[in-house]
Amino acid sequence: MLQLNGKDVKWKKDTGTIQDLLASYQLENKIVIVERNKEIIGKERYHEVELCDRDVIEIVHFVGGG
């Protein structure tokens, strides 16, 4: 179980990375900021940071408009 943007989410994989999580929400090609347990994770680390049970993840993505 993860907490994603304030909501409990069942993560279907035993293991996975932030990159896997972004792909599952079709955000891998978007400009996002990811925070894991109050630490901002740089994009260059998305493929190596493993998700753990009870991680608290915040994903912020930007939407254009005017």
Curated annotation (Swiss-Prot):
<keyword id="KW-0784">Thiamine biosynthesis</keyword>
<dbReference type="Pfam" id="PF02597">
    <property type="entry name" value="ThiS"/>
</dbReference>
<dbReference type="InterPro" id="IPR003749">
    <property type="entry name" value="ThiS/MoaD-like"/>
</dbReference>
<comment type="similarity">
    <text>Belongs to the sulfur carrier protein ThiS family.</text>
</comment>
<dbReference type="GO" id="GO:0052837">
    <property type="term" value="P:thiazole biosynthetic process"/>
</dbReference>
<dbReference type="GO" id="GO:0009228">
    <property type="term" value="P:thiamine biosynthetic process"/>
</dbReference>
<keyword id="KW-0597">Phosphoprotein</keyword>
<dbReference type="GO" id="GO:1902503">
    <property type="term" value="C:adenylyltransferase complex"/>
</dbReference>
<dbReference type="InterPro" id="IPR016155">
    <property type="entry name" value="Mopterin_synth/thiamin_S_b"/>
</dbReference>
<dbReference type="InterPro" id="IPR012675">
    <property type="entry name" value="Beta-grasp_dom_sf"/>
</dbReference>
<dbReference type="GO" id="GO:0000166">
    <property type="term" value="F:nucleotide binding"/>
</dbReference>
<dbReference type="InterPro" id="IPR010035">
    <property type="entry name" value="Thi_S"/>
</dbReference>
<comment type="pathway">
    <text>Cofactor biosynthesis; thiamine diphosphate biosynthesis.</text>
</comment>
<comment type="function">
    <text>Is the sulfur donor in the synthesis of the thiazole phosphate moiety of thiamine phosphate.</text>
</comment>
<feature type="modified residue" description="Glycyl adenylate; alternate">
    <location>
        <position position="66"/>
    </location>
</feature>
<dbReference type="GO" id="GO:0009229">
    <property type="term" value="P:thiamine diphosphate biosynthetic process"/>
</dbReference>
<keyword id="KW-0547">Nucleotide-binding</keyword>
<comment type="subunit">
    <text>Forms heterodimers with ThiG.</text>
</comment>
<protein>
    <recommendedName>
        <fullName>Sulfur carrier protein ThiS</fullName>
    </recommendedName>
</protein>
<dbReference type="GO" id="GO:0097163">
    <property type="term" value="F:sulfur carrier activity"/>
</dbReference>
<feature type="modified residue" description="1-thioglycine; alternate">
    <location>
        <position position="66"/>
    </location>
</feature>
